[in-house]
Amino acid sequence: MSWDDEEFEVRTSTKDQPMVVSWDDEFNNDDDDALLESWDAEEVPKQKQKPKAAPKAAKKVDKKGETVLLEIDTLDEKTRKELLKKAELNSDLNNAAALFDGLGVAEEHPRARALRQEEELAALSRPAALTKQTPFESHPLFSEAETKSDFQDLRKALSTAIAGMAEKSSLNYSGALAIDLIRDVAKPLSIESIRQTVATLNVLIKEKERQERQARLAKVKGGTATGGAGKKKAKAARPNLGGAFKKDQEFSLEDNSEFADFGDDDFM
């Protein structure tokens, strides 16, 4: 018996089982990575696939279907135009600044200069806030006082403003303001003017005394403005009976002689 007599079955290639060209083809269907051509080759990490971007969120729509107004839509026409004009001007200025920035142009833009001048004029026309350090002399009533009429207007304004302080504190008004103020104001006056001031104050004193006396006596019945107790009440007068009970006409009931004899006319 020889080896030639034995029959061997030789497997033939089919379309379903293609021939393996390389070792890598054999492991293509495996989960393992393909074999490297050399053991010394560096392993290149695989790039991870970027996740797909999520679709943008759809814009919110009003459930009621109503149009949502912006803040600028609620303004009146004039204000809205001013805001739009200002926004357009700012946009132009920003574009011009970005354009000329690279060119090294240091000159101020005409619109920017006009806007700055307008703001400066508005700041000058705006009245300054009053503080404790604001000098009274800068007020026109002081700085423009020249004629007698101007001084009278100044007096009326000062008297109204200062006299109103008495309502806050009468004690401080008299002790810390009015008395010392009268003295300080009277210092530049001449002696004759001070005497006139004293006479005016004396008249005021008498007027205040009269008012206080009237107010006090108004609470008492029968009082007078001069401080008296008033007129006394007149006593009731006795009725005049025509002298019927005078002494010379008195008669006695015991003397009946006149009534004793009635004469012939006596019916008894």
Curated annotation (Swiss-Prot):
Q: Which Pfam families match?
A: eIF3_subunit
GO terms for MF: translation initiation factor activity
Q: Where is this region: Disordered?
A: 1-27, 40-63, 217-249
Q: Which PANTHER family match?
A: EUKARYOTIC TRANSLATION INITIATION FACTOR 3 SUBUNIT J
- Keyword Magnesium among record annotations: no
Q: What's the name of its gene?
A: HCR1
Q: Which domain of life is it from?
A: Eukaryota
| Family designation | Belongs to the eIF-3 subunit J family.
What is the scientific name of the source organism?
Eremothecium gossypii (strain ATCC 10895 / CBS 109.51 / FGSC 9923 / NRRL Y-1056) (Yeast)
Locations listed in the record: Cytoplasm
Q: Tell me, how does this one assemble?
A: Component of the eukaryotic translation initiation factor 3 (eIF-3) complex.
Against InterPro entries, the record matches this protein to:
eIF3-like_dom_sf (IPR023194), eIF3j (IPR013906)
GO CC, sorted alphabetically, is: eukaryotic 43S preinitiation complex; eukaryotic 48S preinitiation complex; eukaryotic translation initiation factor 3 complex
Provide the protein name.
Eukaryotic translation initiation factor 3 subunit J
Q: Which UniProt keywords apply?
A: Coiled coil, Cytoplasm, Initiation factor, Protein biosynthesis
Q: Does the keyword Oxidoreductase apply?
A: no
Listed GO biological process terms: formation of cytoplasmic translation initiation complex; maturation of SSU-rRNA from tricistronic rRNA transcript (SSU-rRNA, 5.8S rRNA, LSU-rRNA); nuclear-transcribed mRNA catabolic process, nonsense-mediated decay
* Function summary: Component of the eukaryotic translation initiation factor 3 (eIF-3) complex, which is involved in protein synthesis of a specialized repertoire of mRNAs and, together with other initiation factors, stimulates binding of mRNA and methionyl-tRNAi to the 40S ribosome. The eIF-3 complex specifically targets and initiates translation of a subset of mRNAs involved in cell proliferation.
Q: Where is the composition biased (Basic residues)?
A: 47-58
